[in-house]
Amino acid sequence: MWITQEITPYLRKEYTIEAKLLDVRSEHNILEIFKSKDFGEIAMLNRQLLFKNFLHIESELLAHMGGCTKKELKEVLIVDGFDLELAHQLFKYDTHIDFVQADEKILDSFISFFPHFHEVKNNKNFTHAKQLLDLDIKKYDLIFCLQEPDIHRIDGLKRMLKEDGVFISVAKHPLLEHVSMQNALKNMGGVFSVAMPFVAPLRILSNKGYIYASFKTHPLKDLMTPKIEALTSVRYYNEDIHRAAFALPKNLQEVFKDNIKS
């Protein structure tokens, strides 16, 4: 048996699996979890794959990309995703997290897949809301959008940022789908003073890219090394990974030169 990951519309990967462990379907999402000899458990969420053995890569990168460039991290918002491991990493900063996800059926089905599921859900500083309107009106130090946002989503979320707040969003991989990344940078750059693409260095099982955006905060100039050195129980993230995440090959520097704002 095998499952197929669509990297781009023209590129696919196949993974051998041993068994299907779970199949859950809701109105808007489909979650399947498989057992794999080489990769442990693999979750397929709407055709996108998550590897249980490597969940820490994305969660550490995103959490500390934001956390180590901000002096204070009191309020964090996570929207359009299910990644509770991201919240687990963010709790290293003693912050409050608002997590917006309407699909409780799918979220609760990750109970055995996310290693820190119960720890996060039971944390007194974690608030799960079905929609943004259910939350108290406030400004955030850090906002994560775990699906690529359109211009209207960007406009709505940027109004919820503090003046020096950071907005981190998922995008297409700049090497695999540079036109899509270019368009995403245009959307972000039309709103923010800083808009820079990055990827997870040495992560070979992903087709994701990301964008770091802010009105005032810069992901490299404002990086605080003492905060990185103070982190405990991290397996992937360090200062070298942080800086390397923003490195681009020369051809992509040319492609994005009019879209990157730094």
Curated annotation (Swiss-Prot):
Stretches assigned to the PABS domain: 1-249
SUPFAM superfamilies in alphabetical order: S-adenosyl-L-methionine-dependent methyltransferases
Residue numbers binding spermidine: 83
Enzyme superclass (EC): transferase
Record field: catalytic activity: S-adenosyl 3-(methylsulfanyl)propylamine + putrescine = S-methyl-5'-thioadenosine + spermidine + H(+)
InterPro entries linked: PABS, SAM-dependent_MTases_sf, Spermi_synthase, Spermidine_synt_N, Spermidine_synt_N_sf
Activity regulation details: Inhibited by methylglyoxal bis(cyclopentylamidinohydrazone)(MGBCP).
Biological process (GO), any one: spermidine biosynthetic process
Pathway as given in its UniProt record: Amine and polyamine biosynthesis; spermidine biosynthesis; spermidine from putrescine: step 1/1
Entries under NCBIfam families matching the protein: PRK00536.1
Quaternary structure annotation from Swiss-Prot or TrEMBL: Homodimer.
Official protein name in the record: Polyamine aminopropyltransferase
Organism listed in the record: Helicobacter pylori (strain ATCC 700392 / 26695)
